[in-house]
Regions:
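Short, charged recognition helix plus adjacent turn
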Residues: 28, 40, 52, 59-72
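The alpha-helix within a helix-turn-helix
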Residues: 9, 20, 51
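Short alpha-helical DNA-recognition segment
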Residues: 14-33
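Helix-turn-helix DNA-binding elements, focusing on the entry/boundary residues of the two helices
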Residues: 5, 16, 27, 44-47
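A short, Lys/Arg-rich alpha-helix, primarily the initiator
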Residues: 1-12
Length: 72
């Protein structure tokens, strides 16, 4: 599970459905990304989209993803 991603979403007061809509994907696909079931290796397109949705630099998303990967 990508706890960091859930934390960002909650801080921005967004639902999974809202994030999915902003990314142009279904709520269930976004849920799978957040739960680590999809995009096990997050690609640049998804990382860029998340950075836009959460209004953070893409480098922040990449760093959080790398930290998460290293801790597993």
């Amino acid at each position: 599970m990508r706890v960091w991603l859930k934390k960002l979403r909650i801080e921005k007061q967004l639902t999974m459905k809202e994030v999915g809509e902003k990314l142009g994907i279904s709520e269930s696909y976004y849920c799978a990304i957040e739960n680590g079931e999809r995009q096990k290796k997050m690609d640049v397109v998804v990382a860029s989209g998340l950075a836009t949705v959460f209004d953070v630099p893409i480098a922040h998303i990449v760093q959080l993803e790398q930290n998460d990967t290293l801790s597993q």
